C-alpha cells in the first residue's frame, strides 16, 4: 500500500536517492536537501512524500514566499519514481498538499513546473496555467517599469544570501549548454536601471521579461507559470498576467554560477 505523509529527518537519504535516479542533474545530496528544507529563511517549509514498502517513491515540496500580503507558497521538487509515475501517486501527493494548505489558510501556491507536468496539474488537479515565461536574449535589460506590479516574490537580505550566497543588487549567472555560454539575469532589485551586457564583459543577456509572457503555448520552449488558488476571493486578480513579475532566479532550476 502506498502511503502519503510529511517527510521527516529519517527520509532525507531516501528522498535524495529518489532525486538521483535519472542522472542527478541538480547534484542532489543530503546537504542540498537540508539547504532547501532546513536552512530556508522562512518558516513553513514542507516536504511531502509517497512511500511504498519503506521506499520513497514520490516527492513534492513547498517553500513559503513573500508576495504582497498573501499567504503564499512556491511549489518545488516534484518527482516520482518512473516505475510508479501515475495519477494515483500524483493525486495522493496533491491531496496531502491541498489538505495542508487548507488547514493553514494558504491563499495560493504557485510554481514553474516543466510543461508536461503543468498540463497534468491543470487537467486533473485544479491548477491554472496563467501564462508562459518566454526567454528574451538582448544586449541589455531593464525591469524598472515592472517593479510596481503587485505580484512578485519579495527577497529579504536573508533570502538573497540563502538563494545566491551573497547580497547584491543584480545576479548574472553563466550557463553552458550545447557548446556555448549564455548569461542569465537571475535577479535584479528595483534599484537596478537599464543595464548593458558589455558592462559585465559579455555580449548579451538571457532573461524572463513581462514582454515575453504569453498565454498560449508556442513552438519555442517556454516555462509555464501555474497557480492553485485556495482563497477564491482573489482569483481574478491572481490570474491576471499583468499583475505578475517573475524573475528567473525565482525558480530553483536556475543554479547561480557567478561570472568571476
Question: Where would I find each of the regions flagged by the language model?
Answer:
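A short beta-loop-alpha structural element at the N-terminal edge
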Residues: 3-15
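Hydrophobic residues on conserved beta-strands that form the core of alpha/beta folds
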Residues: 4, 75, 194-196
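Amide-forming acyltransferase catalytic core, primarily the GNAT-like/NAT-type
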Residues: 13-52, 102-108, 115-197
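Short, histidine-centered active-site or binding-site loop motifs used for metal coordination
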Residues: 19, 77-82
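Short beta-strand micro-motifs in enzyme catalytic cores
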Residues: 46-48, 71-73, 171, 224-228
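Conserved beta-strand in the GNAT
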Residues: 49, 55-64, 72-74, 79, ...
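Active-site/acyl-donor-binding loops of N-acyltransferases
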Residues: 64, 108-149, 186-260
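Conserved acetyl-CoA-binding loop-helix of GNAT-fold acetyltransferases
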Residues: 80, 85-101, 197-208
Amino acid at each position: 500500500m502506498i502511503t502519503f505523509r510529511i517527510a521527516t529527518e529519517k527520509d532525507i537519504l531516501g528522498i535524495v536517492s529518489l532525486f538521483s535516479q535519472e542522472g542527478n542533474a541538480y547534484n542532489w545530496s543530503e546537504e542540498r536537501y537540508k539547504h532547501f528544507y532546513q536552512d530556508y529563511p522562512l518558516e513553513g517549509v514542507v516536504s511531502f512524500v509517497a512511500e511504498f514498502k519503506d521506499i520513497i517513491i514520490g516527492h513534492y515540496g513547498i517553500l513559503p514566499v513573500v508576495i504582497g500580503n498573501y499567504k503564499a507558497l512556491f511549489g518545488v521538487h516534484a518527482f516520482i519514481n518512473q516505475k510508479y509515475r501515475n495519477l494515483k501517486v500524483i493525486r495522493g501527493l496533491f491531496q496531502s498538499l491541498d489538505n495542508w494548505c487548507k488547514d493553514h489558510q494558504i491563499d495560493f501556491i504557485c510554481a514553474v513546473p516543466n510543461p508536461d507536468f503543468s498540463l497534468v496539474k491543470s487537467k486533473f488537479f485544479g491548477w491554472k496555467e496563467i501564462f508562459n515565461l518566454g526567454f528574451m536574449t538582448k544586449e541589455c535589460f531593464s525591469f524598472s517599469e515592472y517593479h510596481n506590479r503587485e505580484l512578485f516574490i519579495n527577497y529579504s537580505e536573508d533570502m538573497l544570501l540563502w538563494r545566491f550566497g551573497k547580497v547584491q543588487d543584480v545576479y548574472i549567472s553563466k550557463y553552458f549548454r550545447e557548446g556555448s555560454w549564455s548569461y542569465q539575469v537571475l535577479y535584479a532589485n528595483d534599484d537596478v536601471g537599464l543595464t548593458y551586457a558589455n558592462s559585465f564583459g559579455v555580449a548579451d543577456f538571457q532573461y524572463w521579461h513581462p514582454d515575453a509572457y504569453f498565454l498560449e503555448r508556442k513552438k519555442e520552449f517556454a516555462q509555464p507559470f501555474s497557480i492553485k488558488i485556495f482563497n477564491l476571493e482573489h482569483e481574478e486578480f491572481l490570474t491576471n498576467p499583468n499583475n505578475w513579475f517573475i524573475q528567473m532566479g525565482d525558480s530553483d532550476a536556475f543554479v547561480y554560477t557567478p561570472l568571476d
